[in-house]
Amino acid sequence: MKIIRNLEFQGKQTAVCIGKFDGIHRGHRLLIEQAKKENKPIVMISFSVDEAKVLYTPYEKEKLAEYLGIDCLLEIPLTKEFCSQTPEEFAKKLLCDTCDAASVIVGSDFRFGAGRSGDTNTLQQLGEKLGFSVTVLSKLELGGEVVSSTRIRSLIGTGKMEQANELLGTPYFLTGVVRKGNQLGRTMETPTANIYPDAHKVLPPYGVYAVFVDVEGKRYRGICNLGVKPTIPGENEVGFEVWLFNFSG
């Protein structure tokens, strides 16, 4: 999968799905599934937005997009120049000149162009003019509510992981840096790994969780404690202390 973080990309007759894609949840995946039906290279356009908290970090989003069969992830920085474009400039420069879009798939609430002046009707009119088809998909509802990143953040933040996973479509996951700890667990013959997630990552409440951990292509079951280490002086950084079953290394 190609990962592009600027407009220096040249597609060729692509199927383009556009969205924020924080979490790439089940609603987002409807766009991806529709794009696959076009039998063309799939470009997923996402926008780099400074969020206080995100479901998935840029690296995690890349790994999930690749897993879902995306051919190119195009991350567009929302610069002042980019945001000042008219809807037609957006369609011409990004969808036509950069992606060479044959088809574009968006959600029903899609807005684009300066001041969010363009909507799905605008996009369909521009598609007719510029030569690409447009498919607009309704919002996915589960449990009587729209599936959204905001809803999933709330579920994770309150520890309702099974419900969050149902909306995500795959189990919530995280990546992080493994650091050498105080090795207190090793003295009790229960060595653990200390994993520190990105500071912007949405995390569940502090507590003990059952986990799966992938290590060098192999998956292990384990348990982890999420939180700080109040009994150890100077340890106040939030992290995961993970113990894996049947692991040595």
What are these regions (language model features)?
Residues 7-63:
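N-terminal catalytic cores of NTP/NDP-binding nucleotidyl/phosphoryl-transfer enzymes
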Residues 61-77:
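A glycine-rich helix N-cap at a beta->alpha junction
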Residues 52-53, 82-84:
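Acidic-and-aromatic substrate-binding clefts and catalytic sites of carbohydrate-active enzymes
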Residues 13, 181-249:
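Phosphate/ribose-recognition catalytic cores of enzymes acting on nucleotide-derived substrates
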Residues 84-191, 206:
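Classical nucleotidyltransferase
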